[in-house]
Amino acid sequence: MQVLPPGSTGGPSRLFILRPVATTLLMAAILLAGIIGYRFLPVAALPEVDYPTIQVVTLYPGASPDVMTSAVTAPLERQFGQMSGLKQMSSQSSGGASVVTLQFQLTLPLDVAEQEVQAAINAATNLLPSDLPNPPIYSKVNPADPPIMTLAVTSNAMPMTQVEDMVETRVAQKISQVSGVGLVTLAGGQRPAVRVKLNAQAVAALGLTSETVRTAITGANVNSAKGSLDGPERAVTLSANDQMQSADEYRRLIIAYQNGAPVRLGDVATVEQGAENSWLGAWANQAPAIVMNVQRQPGANIIATADSIRQMLPQLTESLPKSVKVTVLSDRTTNIRASVRDTQFELMLAIALVVMIIYLFLRNIPATIIPGVAVPLSLIGTFAVMVFLDFSINNLTLMALTIATGFVVDDAIVVIENISRYIEKGEKPLAAALKGAGEIGFTIISLTFSLIAVLIPLLFMGDIVGRLFREFAVTLAVAILISAVVSLTLTPMMCARMLSQQSLRKQNRFSRACERMFDRVIASYGRGLAKVLNHPWLTLSVAFATLLLSVMLWIVIPKGFFPVQDNGIIQGTLQAPQSSSYASMAQRQRQVAERILQDPAVQSLTTFVGVDGANSTLNSTRLQINLKPLDARDDRVQQVISRLQTAVATIPGVALYLQPTQDLTIDTQVSRTQYQFSLQATTLDALSHWVPKLQNALQSLPQLSEVSSDWQDRGLAAWVNVDRDSASRLGISMADVDNALYNAFGQRLISTIYTQANQYRVVLEHNTASTPGLAALETIRLTSRDGGTVPLSAIARIEQRFAPLSINHLDQFPITTFSFNVPEGYSLDDAVQAILDTEKTLALPADITTQFQGSTLAFQAALGSTVWLIVAAVVAMYIVLGVLYESFIHPITILSTLPTAGVGALLALIIAGSELDIIAIIGIILLIGIVKKNAIMMIDFALAAEREQGMSPRDAIFQACLLRFRPILMTTLAALLGALPLMLSTGVGAELRRPLGIAMVGGLLVSQVLTLFTTPVIYLLFDRLSLYVKSRFPRHKEEA
């Protein structure tokens, strides 16, 4: 048994050093738990931080935006506004469609929100129009969230109406049942229907009206209960031929008698099988298609959901005819998986670089193996905790583990270096392990808890940004904590068994060359440090200048919210003049699609024209452009967008707005551009006065580009001004007028055909082919009191006016949203400030309010809390260090290193042309935890030298700096190399990772050079200050 020297108790590590088998088994258990946990971790792009969001869609074909607002949207809004936990309610009322989007507080479960929405819809039912074709339909989905998967269904042999019927009954329903799917929408609008196109002249010639025809059809097609007969022995169910299923049956329907002769529907109308809405269409790569957009529920796992759909697709497509082709046009999980793979590669590269730097410094294979074991053990063990906390493998958690690579190795390096130093002095390995581990134990605890303290403020960040980085902070904190445990248990135990004087002294030519190099570097550092200590005020001036420079750089650096990712999918809106018809929009989309598909980076394209729950107005076309994989194209997404907009710019009468899809979706409405600013008033008249003024002012700002608004009040409208007195004299009511107009021009759904698989509509309208435009109104006839027919022109005057194409509300009040992008050379912070200055210049009245929306609002909130976040991190670390050192002074000395990290990070971001965004700020906060390690290692040894060896403060700090120079350099380089793969990343999702790497590498480079000299000087300054205070207040000294 070895005789241990006095003081070599080993501290908390003693038990683990002396019991190697128990220590090994304990570490094996941590490793096994991590491996098992990894298999159960889901994969995602980012942590699940979606607001609980529900979309309520109500379709009322033929209704104007005014009618939709007053008759549908307003009653629903009044009921929704009473729900608890509602964060924001926005609505959009357009011709025939009302879409209300409800965003709830993050703390409210989605299922609870769903129950409240259903109850509110039920309460509003009696207030909605009685002839509403379908009740409001709600979906647990955020409309601004891009589809997780887009599929196109095409056929060269079958009409699109049959294709849609098959897709709706055989495919869409099954996909909707997949766990995690929130909504499956079919773009293209080709639901089968029987269309009845009345010949107005033929109807009038027979003395009939459209209302006569409608009544006849609705009475002839019914499907109601008829009862049953219950006899003494048998029961008989009653049924009848009350249903008409085909266009031929409707064509033969007798609608009236003239002079004893039957008038059949086919005599006055064209009856045919067609689509329910003839003003809807979708195309995939210019071919007519039914496009299925699959959106996930907020909070659902996107990878698991997409995998379930793909597993189901072969079975579903087998049930379709051979001529029907189903193509997956886009799958967001492809890029998510690629991004996660790239991040995993960078994690492995970081581990390899860190192990390499360890070997370079230690030049000993056994000594390199020890931290080489500690790093993967700490990282893998973290997976077990992540499973317990319901985390996922995503870009942020993998970034945390990549950064943790440099952190977790620090503890092991510090322990190994200290134990090796005693072995090289002649101590036995076991005694050296006990003594070295006991001596360094407090330093490891200080490093660990002070670093975790930096992360604590991240856990208390509010709103969606706080939720986003909670997984990052907790994952990193867990890895650091496990690393500390490993460094105080397994590392010293392995040192006691694997290190020896022979192994440490065994050197080859490379080792000796490295040793000579390190000796020269340390000697040079010692000479430089001696000069610096002799000129403290010059050094303090440099430290103070660094502080001022960090503040200046913070003010001038461009600031942003979240890096714009290249996910390979572009969402777009094609805008045309407000009076554009469906036919003209279909022609325009063909021209635009042709230009877009010619671009070498484009893989596929889907376009949609018409009004439904996804598209609000007829003069806009929705596009989704799917790009080739990143390694198969030369340009990033922003370059492709610029090229496409240039190509389309020469097409007259259209404006194309494009933006790349992002993994983080904060908006609740589909926007034309990345950022939004809203103008809200109590009335539409107030908005109409101020919107043009503000839009002109915003368009003149150089900090903004592609400025547009959703205010569209120049749509053509025909105002039917009825002479109520004349109408009353003829026995014609306003309801008669509305019904006649609705029958003629509203694609009115007048009856339902029920089948075993689905339900289909009978659509009534006038055949306006021979009388287009306003002339069609002259064909309208109404039934008077005496049974005769009266032309509409006899009781009404037709006026052409302008009317809004859509009416938007936010929390029940009218609102207009301005969309904008930020041009190259400016930051989002510049744009926000320019908008605020413009608002002040315009001097808006008190009843007009403005607000940033979506990601711009989140940016404002994040920017406002950033300074407080950093202050909170510093205060938290000061408190922890003060408790550990039982001193008010030493924590200040340690924290004095922070400005150097800030200067380095900000300079690196500016040089790299990167904005100070949320990711970069997280990097700066992490630097706070890393950089202070240097000071802790210096001060710990200086205090020990003063206390145990009686050295003067100057000699103690000088010796501590030289003794700890090598581990400081080693740990800093390890952290730097851990961040280097992130800084140099170029794969999918690199935009997200790069700012963190740039900030950390820049901060570490600058701080490493400066803190090695400024920390000793500041230590001595505060020591003299402490002596001065004690001399002026001797009572404190006596009490001490």
Swiss-Prot record:
Location(s) in or outside the cell? Cell inner membrane
Could you name the Gene Ontology cellular component terms for this entry?
plasma membrane
**Coiled-coil annotated residue ranges, if any:** none
Swiss-Prot/TrEMBL keywords: Cell inner membrane, Cell membrane, Membrane, Transmembrane, Transmembrane helix, Transport
User: Which Pfam families does the UniProt entry name for this protein?
Assistant: ACR_tran
Instruction: Tell me the domain of life.
Output: Bacteria
Could you tell me the membrane topology recorded for this protein?
Multi-pass membrane protein
The answer on whether this UniProt entry bears the keyword Hydrolase reads no
Question: What InterPro entries does UniProt report for this protein, alphabetically?
Answer: AcrB_DN_DC_subdom (IPR027463), Acrflvin-R (IPR001036), Multidrug-R_MdtB (IPR022831)
Q: Which Gene Ontology molecular function entries are recorded, alphabetically?
A: xenobiotic transmembrane transporter activity
Database matches in SUPFAM superfamilies: Multidrug efflux transporter AcrB pore domain, PN1, PN2, PC1 and PC2 subdomains, Multidrug efflux transporter AcrB TolC docking domain, DN and DC subdomains, Multidrug efflux transporter AcrB transmembrane domain
Any transmembrane segments, and where?
25-45, 347-367, 369-389, 396-416, 440-460, 472-492, 537-557, 863-883, 888-908, 910-930, 968-988, 998-1018
PANTHER family assigned to the protein according to its UniProt record, in alphabetical order: MULTIDRUG RESISTANCE PROTEIN MDTB, PTHR32063
Write out the similarity annotation.
Answer: Belongs to the resistance-nodulation-cell division (RND) (TC 2.A.6) family. MdtB subfamily.
Quaternary organization: Part of a tripartite efflux system composed of MdtA, MdtB and MdtC. MdtB forms a heteromultimer with MdtC.
The protein in question is named: Multidrug resistance protein MdtB
The organism is: Salmonella choleraesuis (strain SC-B67)
> Top-down, what is the taxonomic lineage of the species of origin?
Bacteria, Pseudomonadati, Pseudomonadota, Gammaproteobacteria, Enterobacterales
